[in-house]
Amino acid sequence: MGSINNNFNTNNNSNTDLDRDWKTALNIPKKDTRPQTDDVLNTKGNTFEDFYLKRELLMGIFEAGFEKPSPIQEEAIPVAITGRDILARAKNGTGKTAAFVIPTLEKVKPKLNKIQALIMVPTRELALQTSQVVRTLGKHCGISCMVTTGGTNLRDDILRLNETVHILVGTPGRVLDLASRKVADLSDCSLFIMDEADKMLSRDFKTIIEQILSFLPPTHQSLLFSATFPLTVKEFMVKHLHKPYEINLMEELTLKGITQYYAFVEERQKLHCLNTLFSKLQINQAIIFCNSTNRVELLAKKITDLGYSCYYSHARMKQQERNKVFHEFRQGKVRTLVCSDLLTRGIDIQAVNVVINFDFPKTAETYLHRIGRSGRFGHLGLAINLINWNDRFNLYKIEQELGTEIAAIPATIDKSLYVAENDETVPVPFPIEQQSYHQQAIPQQQLPSQQQFAIPPQQHHPQFMVPPSHQQQQAYPPPQMPSQQGYPPQQEHFMAMPPGQSQPQY
């Protein structure tokens, strides 16, 4: 009898040791020591363990570098786990994606081989990023996630759906197509999530979303997340959500860590001004926004002519090309990305510390989403707006609507406003998997070549003149992105298009 008790006590002690030591065996990344603002620090003091999440999920959370929940995660995760509908409003870059991914992974049953959660996003890039967050946080959970977007092979999606898929991440058009063909069975999908809900319920997508909902069970749970809530979102809430729990963390609309400036310049002097900014600012990575796809390509060509590394991305590019640009910019292989508003929604690249509006946006909503690409997760960032005479009324209107102040740019910008003291702590984004779960590898000869990305020679354009004295100005200061963290030194030969080498496919 004594030996039995001894054995029981020994086993009990060993189990206790295992419970105590499971964290020590995790592969936790280096701590991000950059200063943060109250956007993510103003919490109630809860930890992820306080939510009683399954251990496999906690392992993925900690191995992704998460330490404590942000305010939106603290509010949304426990309520979502109870099964209640949620309407959540929080700033860009405060952890909204994890706020719905974590309860989704907690609620999905790995042994039930059905689609149990549908995550809808407005853009292909955001779908790729969200699916990767699902896979990263849920890597120990035995849960299968599939991403499906327009512009990819429909046959591959159909083949993938013949296998087990627990979580489906996609854009509305492709999801509706698969559901209408009865390829994607949503009859057991008990969780419906919309990220960037304001965009999802705009005229572009509202009808499609309504059709998709008809394929879900009537008792499904709905989670809606966004930074802005126009009237269309409220109408959708009244029609489709059952006694939703409303979260509003928007005391102010802009992130506290972003310092905003404007520079008043003539249109023909914008490139000269941009060149000056490049030489004076300590840029880790920068995103430059234009208002049209033609100006995106033209500006990328002009920046390249000045001797700076530069990629571009816009909606008229092939999906495979956009994927390559997005992947390489996330991995720090180039400092500067010129793009249209394609990348204003939800894209999370924490190494971006400067956003430049080469063309000033027309609406406060667009402005808010653009500048939110810097200062991610409570860190510091810089937003610089190049303003001409015709933009002055929009500048005033946006300041009034957002309740923010955009100051005139000073002669010297304090580096403490946007530069981390130790760039080695800047986290490298989750690596996008070399091949998505539902697409076959593309042979080497089918990859887009450098010529496919090339910009046709441009004639003299009076809007983008650069004084001869500035043509040979020095490029960025010495690279601050540490190579051991996945940010290689700046290359000697610069291009305005991604290299035509074999690259990972999505």
UniProtKB/Swiss-Prot annotation:
> Mind listing the GO molecular function terms for this protein?
ATP binding; ATP hydrolysis activity; chromatin binding; mRNA binding; RNA helicase activity
User: Where's it mainly located?
Assistant: cytoplasm
What PROSITE patterns does this protein map onto? DEAD_ATP_HELICASE, HELICASE_ATP_BIND_1, HELICASE_CTER, Q_MOTIF
Where composition is biased (Low complexity), the residues are 1-16
Q: Name one GO biological process term.
A: cellular response to glucose starvation
This entry's Enzyme Commission designation comes to 3.6.4.13
Q: Name one GO cellular component term.
A: cytoplasm
Per UniProt, residues of the Helicase C-terminal domain are: 257-417
InterPro entries tied to this protein: DEAD/DEAH_box_helicase_dom, Helicase_ATP-bd, Helicase_C-like, P-loop_NTPase, RNA-helicase_DEAD-box_CS, RNA_helicase_DEAD_Q_motif
Motif DEAD box, residue numbers: 195-198
Binding-site residues, ATP: 90-97
Q: Outcome of residue 345 to A?
A: Leads to mRNA turnover defect and no growth at 37 degrees Celsius. Impairs RNA binding in vitro
Which reaction is the catalytic activity of this chain? ATP + H2O = ADP + phosphate + H(+)
**Annotated knockout phenotype:** Leads to an increased in autophagy flux. Causes an accumulation of ATG3, ATG7, ATG8, ATG19, ATG20, ATG22 and SNX4/ATG24 transcripts in nutrient-replete conditions.
Q: Where in the cell is it found?
A: Cytoplasm, P-body
Q: Which Pfam families match?
A: DEAD, Helicase_C
Annotated ranges, domain Helicase ATP-binding: 77-247
Give, from the UniProt record, the effect of changing residue 369 to A.
Leads to mRNA turnover defect and no growth at 37 degrees Celsius
Phenotype when changing residue 346 to A: Leads to mRNA turnover defect and no growth at 37 degrees Celsius. Impairs RNA binding in vitro
Primary role: ATP-dependent RNA helicase involved in mRNA turnover, and more specifically in mRNA decapping by activating the decapping enzyme DCP1. Is involved in G1/S DNA-damage checkpoint recovery, probably through the regulation of the translational status of a subset of mRNAs. May also have a role in translation and mRNA nuclear export. Required for sporulation. Blocks autophagy in nutrient-rich conditions by, at least partly, binding and repressing the expression of a set of ATG genes, including ATG3, ATG7, ATG8, ATG19, ATG20, ATG22 and SNX4/ATG24.
The entry assigns this protein to a family as follows: Belongs to the DEAD box helicase family. DDX6/DHH1 subfamily.
What the entry says about domains is: The Q motif is unique to and characteristic of the DEAD box family of RNA helicases and controls ATP binding and hydrolysis.
Known partners and oligomeric status? Associated with the CCR4-NOT complex and possibly other big complexes. Interacts with CDC39/NOT1. Interacts with DCP1, LSM1, and POP2. Interacts with IGO1. Interacts with PAT1 and with KEM1, the major 5'-3' exonuclease.
* Protein name (record): ATP-dependent RNA helicase DHH1
